[in-house]
């Protein structure tokens, strides 16, 4: 069960023209040259997609990620960051990406999947294009003094002799999507996110489809 859709009064999606302008002008996407990708029901399915592409030799970690969302998906709310920082980081990096076990233990969901991807050392750079009307939800403990992401905990530091030091991930936040501009994507994915997006937002999936080749 994915839960009930939030009421329309909670969020008003951008209009079709704004969405298309963002895809073409800010992201450099083209209907004439669609990019491989996929549309999911929930955000965390991106992990399964990335893993499948890596196993097929089509995606090499670590890779850059551009995250366009109202939420950071870095575990601001429950269950928080502790499990990833204290349990996942103590494991051998090559043995961390056990998605089924995390889901079965109710540790992984769509509100924290990017934190897991960072802990898997899949991401080399993260750009977050957020809704300026949303609340800031980036856990401060994930950031270093320069504002980049540096995952660690007291217990994970003790394991650095075996696992190596966790990488520093360049992290950039765009509060105004018009200030963002980046092209050259290898893959484009989108989540319907019915727990967080009203039904009227589903039309954005239809707007995106001409720009991707579902794979």
Report residues per predicted region:
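Conserved alpha-helical scaffold segments that buttress catalytic/binding sites
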Residues: 2-215
């Amino acid at each position: 069960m994915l839960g009930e859709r939030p009421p329309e009064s909670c969020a008003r999606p951008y209009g079709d023209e704004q969405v298309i302008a963002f895809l073409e002008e800010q992201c450099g996407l083209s209907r004439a040259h669609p990019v491989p990708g996929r549309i999911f029901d929930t955000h965390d399915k991106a992990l399964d997609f990335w893993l499948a592409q890596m196993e097929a030799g089509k995606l090499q970690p670590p890779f850059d990620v551009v995250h366009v969302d109202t939420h950071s998906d870095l575990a601001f709310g429950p269950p928080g960051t502790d499990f990833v920082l204290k349990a996942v980081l103590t494991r051998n990096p090559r043995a961390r990406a056990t998605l089924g076990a995390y889901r079965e233990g109710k540790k992984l969901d769509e509100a924290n999947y990017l934190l897991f991807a960072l802990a898997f050392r899949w991401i080399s750079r993260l750009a977050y294009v957020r809704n300026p009307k949303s609340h800031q939800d980036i856990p401060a403990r994930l950031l270093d003094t320069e504002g980049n992401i540096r995952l660690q905990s007291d217990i994970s530091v003790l394991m650095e002799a075996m696992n190596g030091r966790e990488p520093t991930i360049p992290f950039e936040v765009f509060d105004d999507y018009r200030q963002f501009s980046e092209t050259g994507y290898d893959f484009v994915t989108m989540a319907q996110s019915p727990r967080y997006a009203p039904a009227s937002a589903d039309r954005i999936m239809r707007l995106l489809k001409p720009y991707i080749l579902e794979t």
